[in-house]
Swiss-Prot record:
It holds the Pfam family tRNA_U5-meth_tr. The keyword 4Fe-4S applies. Signal peptide: none annotated. [4Fe-4S] cluster binds at residues 62, 68, 71, 138. S-adenosyl-L-methionine binds at residues 254, 280, 285, 301-302, 328, 342. Its EC number is 2.1.1.35. NCBIfam families: rumA (TIGR00479). This is tRNA (uracil(54)-C(5))-methyltransferase. Catalyzes the formation of 5-methyl-uridine at position 54 (m5U54) in tRNA. It comes from Pyrococcus furiosus (strain ATCC 43587 / DSM 3638 / JCM 8422 / Vc1). It is an enzyme of class 2 (transferase).
Length: 411
């Protein structure tokens, strides 16, 4: 079947004749689909030819683009990526939303999780959990990835390290997680293994500031486990607009440090008053930043380790912010000027929505990684109206987008 790709779906797949999804295609491409496969409710083109390129198509910087499942939009020029995301938001939210572009579109990621198998070191092939695409480097992470992967290959060969056979679920070394403070240059390497003995990696990774070893004792395919520091610093550090953050292997942190600066600045701009409650606070990314700007912050999260890290981050920045373990259903939100919510993709818990409607402050700042649940929650928060809404491209070359909304109380 031949035809021209008219548009992309929300996941970044080209749509041919409204019935076949063509991965790694671009609007305006003329394609010939040779083979399809039924997946869930759609037909996916598993083999296709590009007959004529779209004017918005560019050469992908990554050598394994089209195989690796990470950067599905890297073949589309960046302005067109932003237009795609604007149209996606327009369709979901029914309104125009300004998008702040990422300051960098390569070398911006501060974390990658490299699968380490007998056949390849790299990332999952698109749609194939059992297949890993071998890579020499990751352009969205940057130059350090090339050095780290080269050293990892040397380490495996010279120390005769057993690696992962995915289908058999055998082998010792499963993942190497690489993290980098983009504004500090500090590097952390975390080896994720099954039970056994880890040959000393320190001479191979002498460029790292911190080396960790995590043992995954479960049957789950995850890149974390029971953890211990092997060598070097307990934490590496990242810095956003003069505010310091400690990074631990088990910490969640915004993966695009350069755009995270714009994110915290946007949240600060939307906050009204001095007394702020930081829901879903994580490691204190927003709360510590706002406290550094002179606001009185109390934060809550259900993850005890995240709260421990948030309090450490408050301490190293010498700010008066306190963080406590609590679920989103328990927190007393009375007496604050602004509530910040940054929920998981599933959105706000219904009990929190009710409490916000009944007793919420004048202002809510809603940070969302899922426009669809954002829309649902905004409709449920019927005592509030959107006063300002900005999107940030935290994830270049992917279909994902971050939203920050300022909500003002009506009654």
């Amino acid at each position: 079947m031949r035809g021209i790709i008219k548009r992309l779906n929300d996941d970044g797949f080209g749509i041919l004749y409204n019935k076949i999804l063509v991965p790694f295609s671009a609007p305006g491409d003329e394609v010939e689909v040779l083979k399809t496969e039924k997946q869930k409710r759609a037909k996916i083109a598993t083999e296709w030819r590009l007959l004529r390129s779209s004017p918005i198509r560019v050469g992908a910087r990554c050598k394994v683009f089209g195989k690796c499942g990470g950067c599905i939009l890297q073949h589309i020029n960046y302005n067109s990526q932003l237009e795609f995301k604007k149209e996606k938001l327009r369709k979901i939210l029914g309104r125009e939303v300004e998008i702040i572009p990422s300051p960098r579109i390569f070398g911006h990621r501060n974390r990658i999780d490299l699968a380490v198998t007998v056949n390849a070191i790299g990332f999952r092939e698109k749609g194939k959990w059992w297949s890993v695409v071998d890579v020499e480097e990751c352009p969205v992470f940057g130059k350090t990835s090339k050095k780290a992967i080269e050293r990892l290959r040397e380490y495996i060969e010279e120390e005769k390290v057993s690696t992962w056979k995915i289908r058999e679920d055998s082998g010792f070394l499963r993942y190497m997680v690489l993290r980098e403070g983009k504004f500090t240059g500090e590097i952390m390497v975390n080896f994720v293994t099954k039970e056994g003995e880890l040959p000393d990696p320190t001479s191979y990774f002498d460029f790292a500031d911190s080396i960790y070893w995590s043992i995954n004792r479960s049957k789950s395919d995850v890149s974390y486990g029971d953890i211990e520091k092997y060598w070097g610093k307990e934490f590496i550090m990242e810095e956003l607009d003069g505010v310091k953050y400690l990074i631990h292997p088990n910490s969640f942190f915004q993966t695009n440090s350069y755009q995270a600066v714009n994110l915290v600045k946007t949240v600060e701009k939307f906050v009204e008053g001095e007394k702020v409650v930081d829901m879903y606070s994580g490691v204190g990314t927003f709360g510590v930043y706002l406290a550094k700007k002179g606001m009185k912050v109390v934060g809550f999260d259900s993850n005890a380790f995240a709260i421990e890290m948030a309090n450490k981050n408050a301490e190293i920045n010498n700010v008066e912010a306190e963080f406590f373990v609590a679920s989103d259903r328990e927190v007393d939100i009375k007496g604050f000027d602004t509530v910040i919510v940054d929920p998981p993709r599933a959105g706000l818990h219904p009990k929190l929505v009710k409490r916000l409607n009944d007793h919420g402050p004048e202002t809510i700042v809603y940070v969302s990684c899922n426009p669809k649940t954002f829309k649902v929650n905004i409709e449920q928060l019927n005592n509030y109206i959107i006063e300002e809404l900005i999107a940030l491209d935290m994830f270049p070359h992917t279909p994902h987008i971050e939203l920050v909304g300022k909500l003002r109380r009506l009654v």
